[in-house]
């Protein structure tokens, strides 16, 4: 049986029993590995070293900062089950993604900052209704997540500009240009 000794100081159990104070006083770091029949039996620790170890353990048990994570990150949301068609189905007008859609999208590698807007969902449903393809509910959600990712990134995350808005020229002259 192999074992790892965590201190360079090793002593037999008989030597420790005979004169424990001298053995511990000579110990480097206040710890001695005690062997019995050429096998490690236990560690002998000085009171000062034990106090250091207990203080270190107490320090490590306390949180390193006062920042606490939201419990919501650790708990699965308990939502009422929604009647989702079993198996594959074609897109229908009242289809909705799950309540925890943003969390699921993150699991699929799509980071969404805000939930699906009614306009985005309506556009997605209208497109896929016309296509007439059939997928499982989870696949529809994955398609919606990818669609949102691509749609929102196409304009650098900014909302689409209204094409009917008349632009107004800037009247300021940049530094370095003559006016």
Swiss-Prot record:
Key words of the record: DNA replication, DNA-binding, Primosome
Span list, region Disordered: 156-179
Gene Ontology annotations for the cellular component aspect, listed alphabetically: primosome complex
Signal peptide interval: none
Record field: transmembrane: none
Superkingdom, natural source: Bacteria
GO biological process: DNA replication, synthesis of primer
Function: Involved in the restart of stalled replication forks, which reloads the replicative helicase on sites other than the origin of replication. Can function in multiple replication restart pathways. Displaces ssDNA from a PriB-ssDNA complex. Probably forms a spiral filament on ssDNA.
Quaternary structure (record): Homooligomerizes. Interacts with PriB. Component of the replication restart primosome. Primosome assembly occurs via a 'hand-off' mechanism. PriA binds to replication forks, subsequently PriB then DnaT bind; DnaT then displaces ssDNA to generate the helicase loading substrate.
Family: Belongs to the DnaT family.
Protein name: Replication restart protein DnaT
Lineage, top ranks: Bacteria, Pseudomonadati, Pseudomonadota, Gammaproteobacteria, Enterobacterales
Gene responsible for this protein: dnaT
């Amino acid at each position: 049986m192999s074992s790892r000794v965590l201190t360079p100081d090793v002593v037999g159990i008989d030597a420790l029993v005979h004169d424990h104070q001298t053995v511990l006083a000579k110990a480097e770091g206040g710890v001695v590995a005690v062997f019995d029949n050429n096998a490690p039996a236990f560690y002998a620790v000085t009171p000062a070293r034990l106090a250091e170890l207990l203080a270190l353990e107490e320090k490590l048990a306390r949180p390193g900062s006062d920042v606490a994570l939201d419990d919501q990150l650790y708990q699965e949301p308990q939502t009422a089950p929604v009647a989702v068609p079993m198996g594959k189905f074609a897109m229908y007008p009242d289809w909705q993604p799950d309540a925890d859609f943003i969390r699921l999208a993150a699991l699929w590698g799509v980071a969404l900052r805000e939930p699906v807007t009614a306009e985005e969902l309506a556009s997605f449903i209208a497109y896929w209704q016309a296509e007439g393809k059939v997928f499982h509910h989870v696949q529809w959600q994955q398609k919606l997540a990818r669609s949102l990712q691509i749609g929102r990134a196409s304009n650098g995350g900014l909302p689409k500009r209204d094409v009917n808005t008349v632009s107004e020229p800037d009247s300021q002259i940049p530094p370095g240009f003559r006016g």
